[in-house]
Amino acid sequence: MFSLKMRASKDGVHVSGAERISTENKIEEIANSLIKRALFHENGTPDTINLKLEKITSEITYLKHIPIKTLISNNKETSRNISRNILRKELEVYFLKNGKDFGKIDILIDTAFEIIDKGNMRGAAVLDLDGNRLEEDTEKGVRVKNIDTSEELKSKILADSKLTDRTIDAIAIATKVLNFGFIAEICTSDNYSYNIGYVATKSGYFRIPNLKNEGEFGGRVFFIENSANIEEIFEKIEKTPVIVY
């Protein structure tokens, strides 16, 4: 098996990125699809496309995808409140476990929204329960690498008219991080016209329309306990090959 990674940028600003895990006979087909994805991105034609191919030498981990749930909302304010409620419910468990002040949960969620609304990060921001940024490079964030979904899951997702290719990418990321030590994730797309975002917890992957307005930036934030072994977890989300089914 091989890992393919595509990164595209324009004038040094991130435009598009994607990852796949492939058998040898599918490399050319997948490489072409990744390049096409970069060239025709709605945020602009990139001036740089990097495509990296690596043979996978370690054992692949197979993970069952977290449940996909699509919620209904007609405006950004309602969507933000929905996402806050999901995050608050999950974070309360860990604030209680760690003896943290419940009054600071909303401050933590506010910090996450500030990060995703700023946008233009290649990777994700990581926040502990005190709102501290834990990435080594806060401009780039951390990347979840060496991931893909099974062909069966891809087909299942695309058979649902409400779901898209973006759902495939997102469910792979969310499932991996929640199985490797993170508490929750919130994400909005860096595609300007795509306003569906999501919150992911172990209870599910909650798709929320209008989590941002069209034309706005997007971003991704992971939440983690203060006591977590950050170096080990970062190593796993980057290097452990995972296929989500």
Swiss-Prot record:
Keyword annotations: ATP-binding, Biotin biosynthesis, Ligase, Magnesium, Nucleotide-binding
Q: Where are the transmembrane segments?
A: none
**Pathways involved:** Metabolic intermediate metabolism; pimeloyl-CoA biosynthesis; pimeloyl-CoA from pimelate: step 1/1
Q: Name one GO biological process term.
A: biotin biosynthetic process
Does the UniProt entry include the keyword Transferase? Answer: no
Q: In the Enzyme Commission scheme, what number(s) does this protein have?
A: 6.2.1.14
InterPro entries assigned to the protein according to its UniProt record, in alphabetical order: BioW
Q: Name the source's superkingdom.
A: Archaea
| Ligase keyword on record | yes
According to its UniProt record, which cofactors does this protein need?
Mg(2+)
List the molecular function annotations (GO) for this entry.
Answer: 6-carboxyhexanoate-CoA ligase activity; ATP binding; magnesium ion binding
Catalyzed reaction equations: heptanedioate + ATP + CoA = 6-carboxyhexanoyl-CoA + AMP + diphosphate
Q: What does this protein do?
A: Catalyzes the transformation of pimelate into pimeloyl-CoA with concomitant hydrolysis of ATP to AMP.
* UniProt cross-references to HAMAP family, sorted A to Z: BioW (MF_00668)
Q: Assembly and partners?
A: Homodimer.
Member of which family? Belongs to the BioW family.
In Swiss-Prot or TrEMBL terms, this protein is called 6-carboxyhexanoate--CoA ligase
Say which species the protein is native to: Methanococcus vannielii (strain ATCC 35089 / DSM 1224 / JCM 13029 / OCM 148 / SB)
Lineage of the species this protein comes from: Archaea, Methanobacteriati, Methanobacteriota, Methanomada group, Methanococci
Tell me the gene name: bioW
